[in-house]
Amino acid sequence: MNIQSLINDKVSQALEAAGAPAGSPAAVRQSAKAQFGDYQANGVMGVAKRLGTNPREFAQKVLDVLDLDGIASKTEIAGPGFINIFLSEEFLAKQAEAALADKRLGVAKEEQQNIVADYSAPNVAKEMHVGHLRSTIIGDAVVRTLEFLGHNVTRANHIGDWGTQFGMLIANLERIQKEKGEVSMELSDLEGFYRESKKLYDEDEEFAVTARGYVVKLQSGDEFCAEMWKKLVDVTMVQNQRNYDRLNVSLTRDNVMGESMYNSMLAPIVADLQKQGLAVESEGAQVVFLDEYKNKDGEPMGVIVQKRDGGFLYTTTDIACAKYRYEELNADRVLYFIDSRQHQHLMQAWTIVRKAGYVPESVSLEHHAFGMMLGKDGRPFKTRAGGTVRLADLLDEAEERAAKLIEEKNKDLPAEEKAKIATTVAMAAVKYSDLSKHRTTDYIFDWDNMLAFEGNTAPYMQYAYTRVASIFSKAGLSMDELTGEVKITDEKEKALVAKLMQFEEAVQAVASEGQPHLMCAYLFELAGQFSSFYEACPILNNEDDAVKQSRLKLAALTAKTIKQGLELLGIETLERM
């Protein structure tokens, strides 16, 4: 149950009954401090101002008609007109009981939408690097959350599998195949292969002529070029899949929807834009001038959709992409997890899409932009030599560092188990370190913080789960076979249950805002509340069996909530660390 939403509806009804205009926002929020209750309604002051009445007097009118029977134990007016709402222990206990009995932990499914999520999008014939990490794991966490809420989600891995560079790549692949007969080993170092192809193109004119010829042949559907192109795509995606699998990312080859997929749509789209009078010729190119965007002279900005040589641009592909996702995938909502530097480019493409009538306003096109991963020097994260960090190398180093950490803490565990723990902690640390930061900000990549067992980190959260699970293993009990009822008799119990009941609010916030850090913040707060509860409220050695059973239920619900929350982030838990 979403308690915030429930109370918001109740306060909205009371506002209207007290004389507020219909649809006035109740603005119910979780209270920042316990002294202000569990929730606070902040909408009264805005309404009172519009009505020209005293906010505290209007707040009292709202309270007089506010029906929170069976939900709140107390309400009060605070400050200039805030309404503080304190949930009743009986209500919280009842909700906790229901959540524990439900495999979804009380989280309701939403009305299903068709949602397309565009994320990861590496380039063919290049290895994934750290720059691909944020899109990949942020997108995947949001997708998992949307699916948990019952939505039909199409994962779209918009790989860079088209362009003039494929001429030189195909020419080099052909050269290797003629010389060695087998290419798979040669392509194990994709970056090296790409650099070699570029060097040959720049230095060998005969090679360059062949390469340019292959660009034309590939675009016209030549069988040999198509076969070579497919080989490059296949080898690249096999390597990318290793990274996805290591990171516990749910993308597969079936989710690939590369740039090439939209090739047949590009010429008809330009023709249609011309027909509608949106695209006009300018210096030999086809250009759409947008009043919404001005150049430095204050004139409408021109967006090229076809070059004078007949070639198309990324913008043309993005127009086709949005059109396809609406017309063929029936999208109600399209989420793009793309670097913030691409924002204007996307906005321009979508402006054209709307003007041309390809995607109606009822379909939400959303750019979930993100900042950069920086080194400790505050610059883009690089190798010591100043090169781009390969994602596979980053994950290898994470595993090595985690293995040392686990060895120091648990020397006596079997080697196989230590290796499993190290791998799980390493991947979790890399992901959580990123996901716990606000998506739109740049962040400093720091191994020490990432692998720390204190603070809002993956090791801390994984250990928090293990700590709760160990209560049951010590007692030889199953979390699913507990008896008795949840009874709240202590302030620490109430604080823990109130936080547990905010899980659905966190899930829905991640889904609507595309912000996984909200789930990380929630789980970290929950772990903190459990710590306070655990220190103040004895569980296994409690002499009152009813209290013991109730607290075991709260511990079980905490463990299940942490596990489910981490699963939505694509992070695995461990039964022991």
Curated annotation (Swiss-Prot):
SUPFAM superfamilies: Anticodon-binding domain of a subclass of class I aminoacyl-tRNA synthetases (SSF47323), Arginyl-tRNA synthetase (ArgRS), N-terminal 'additional' domain (SSF55190), Nucleotidylyl transferase (SSF52374)
Main location: cytoplasm
Enzyme Commission number(s) from the entry: 6.1.1.19
Pfam families tied to this protein: Arg_tRNA_synt_N (PF03485), DALR_1 (PF05746), tRNA-synt_1d (PF00750)
Domain of life of the source: Bacteria
Catalytic class of the enzyme: ligase
Subcellular location: Cytoplasm
Keyword tRNA-binding: no
Span of the annotated motif 'HIGH' region: 122-132
Gene3D superfamilies: Arginyl tRNA synthetase N-terminal domain (3.30.1360.70), HUPs (3.40.50.620), Isoleucyl-tRNA Synthetase, Domain 1 (1.10.730.10)
Keyword Nucleotide-binding belongs to the record: yes
Keyword line: Aminoacyl-tRNA synthetase, ATP-binding, Cytoplasm, Ligase, Nucleotide-binding, Protein biosynthesis
Name of the protein: Arginine--tRNA ligase
